């Protein structure tokens, strides 16, 4: 059993690295009118991890133990599986249900064997966690450079809508399918880094946020402690700058919401240490502003250096215009001296977009509205939905989308449309159970704020295979 326990730990160690490969490399197994059949590294990890969990549970005779205590948790996945029977896309429904059960088994395994997460495990896990995050940040920067110098997309792995041709500067997607997924993948490491910085110097037992990176024998004023604090700030700058470079409104908005809740929560719970906590909060917001300014300058510089006719100022203007939904507008008539001596821009290409892309927002709102329209069309659909995996087919059949592959780009509307009022009600019950469980953990502030950030981000997309980290990472971070 010791070998299995060790293997279990190794699987959890590599999970943060595995989830970053959410789309590339991908194993393409086939295609149909309504979906692509693909296998990614996170899915392979999930299957192998579940096989290990089953073996461990069988050896310890835990597979069906405490079933009476877990039955409420199973109501939601059972209902989703039943809804496949009337799904308008049976194959997609079956595959989606399979992934959901794999996730449930993985999370149950993490909970069942949580005693393996000792202090040494937490220390090693954070090394893997932040190490993988820094590597992916470097990959994103490299991706931008490769795109600017004209390296083909099949080598840079940047998506078609992410190249400099769109806005005049590239926005990286790493090994994910789109920048919004890359930005979403950075939410967890960024918020964990924030949590460690704010809680690092709390001293009273009541308010202290335990920092797994701290070692015995070193006080808050020691040289090693100060070095760790500096490295923590540099880590946060790298993560935040990359997050802003993804140019993903959904991920950036989600981060800001999660950060606001975390800061407010930790200040509220600080008690007598509130003054110290407020200083750390101020430091974090200073780092956020610095990182945003750094990313903004990098995007402006990339616009100046790109083959398009964009300038530093037009690049900055486009970023601010897009992130503020067209509210902030900067006129690009006057010359800018910041980078005029760096390079003479002789680009003749014209970028596709001049700023805020209303079509992106309109498409999301249109699909969400179409989903709600179908859901409310009759009592049966309102109560039971069109079946798991059937949202795209339902939109197409009702002439509300151009192809059955089109999906509702809002996870909540998608769940409502596919599983009906019953499914949403069971989801709410599951969330309540999860929150009650998380509130008993030391890292409750971190995990709940991360879940809030993920909840906000799910308003901008839907789908399981490219976002397994949303469900797996909180299950492990709960035990930091």
Would you name each region that the model predicts?
Residues 353-419:
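Long extracytoplasmic/lumenal interhelical loops at the membrane interface
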Residues 9, 78-84, 123-160, 164-168, ...:
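Alpha-helical transmembrane segments of multi-pass inner-membrane proteins
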Residues 1-9, 199-204, 227, 278-287, ...:
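A juxtamembrane structural motif centered on a specific transmembrane helix
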Residues 1-57, 81-86, 253:
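N-terminal signal-anchor transmembrane segment
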Residues 138, 144-147, 245, 266-355, ...:
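A membrane-periplasm/extracellular boundary helix in multi-pass inner-membrane enzymes
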Residues 70-76, 90-112, 124-133, 156:
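Aromatic-anchored transmembrane helix interface
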Residues 108, 206, 396, 418-454:
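Hydrophobic transmembrane alpha-helices and their immediate junctions
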Residues 49, 258-263, 447-459, 463-480:
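Transmembrane alpha-helices of multi-pass inner-membrane enzymes
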């Amino acid at each position: 059993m010791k070998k299995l326990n060790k293997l279990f730990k190794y699987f959890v160690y590599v999970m943060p690295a595995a989830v970053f490969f959410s789309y590339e490399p991908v194993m393409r197994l086939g295609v149909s009118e309504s979906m692509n059949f693909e296998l990614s590294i996170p899915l392979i990890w999930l299957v192998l991890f579940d096989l290990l969990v089953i073996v461990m549970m069988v050896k310890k005779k835990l597979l069906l133990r405490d079933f009476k205590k877990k039955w409420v948790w199973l109501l939601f996945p059972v209902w989703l599986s039943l809804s496949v029977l009337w799904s308008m896309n049976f194959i997609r429904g079956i595959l989606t249900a399979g992934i959901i059960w794999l996730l449930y088994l993985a999370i149950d395994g993490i909970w069942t064997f949580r005693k393996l997460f000792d202090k040494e495990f937490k220390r090693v896990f954070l090394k893997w966690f932040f190490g993988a995050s820094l590597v992916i940040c470097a990959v994103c920067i490299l991706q931008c450079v490769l795109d600017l110098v004209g390296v083909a997309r099949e080598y840079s792995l940047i998506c078609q809508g992410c190249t400099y041709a769109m806005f005049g500067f590239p926005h990286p997607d790493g090994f994910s399918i789109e920048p919004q997924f890359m930005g979403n993948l950075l939410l967890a490491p960024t918020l964990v880094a924030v949590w460690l910085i704010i809680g690092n110097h709390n001293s009273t037992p009541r308010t202290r946020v335990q920092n797994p990176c701290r070692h015995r024998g070193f006080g808050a004023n020691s040289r090693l402690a100060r070095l760790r604090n500096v490295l923590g700030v540099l880590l946060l700058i790298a993560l935040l700058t990359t997050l802003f470079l993804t140019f993903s409104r959904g991920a950036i908005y989600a981060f800001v919401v999660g950060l606001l809740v975390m800061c407010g929560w930790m200040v509220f719970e600080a008690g007598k240490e509130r003054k110290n906590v407020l200083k750390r909060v101020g430091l974090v917001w200073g780092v956020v502003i610095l990182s945003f300014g750094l990313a903004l300058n990098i995007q402006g510089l990339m616009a100046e250096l790109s083959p398009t006719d964009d300038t530093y100022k037009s690049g900055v203007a486009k970023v601010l215009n897009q992130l503020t939904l067209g509210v902030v507008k900067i006129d690009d008539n006057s010359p800018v001296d910041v980078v005029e001596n760096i390079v003479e821009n002789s680009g003749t290409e014209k970028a596709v977009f001049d700023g805020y892309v209303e079509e992106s927002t309109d498409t999301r709102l249109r699909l969400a509205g179409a989903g709600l329209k179908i859901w409310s069309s009759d009592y049966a659909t309102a109560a039971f939905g069109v079946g798991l995996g059937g949202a795209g087919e339902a939109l197409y059949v009702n002439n509300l989308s151009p192809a059955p592959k089109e999906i509702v780009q809002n996870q909540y509307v998608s769940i409502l449309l596919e599983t009906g009022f019953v499914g949403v009600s069971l989801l709410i019950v599951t969330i309540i159970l999860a929150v009650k469980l998380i509130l008993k953990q030391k890292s409750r502030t971190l995990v709940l704020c991360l879940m809030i950030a993920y909840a906000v981000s799910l308003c901008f997309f839907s789908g399981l295979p490219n976002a397994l980290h949303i469900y797996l990472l909180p299950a492990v971070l709960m035990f930091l």
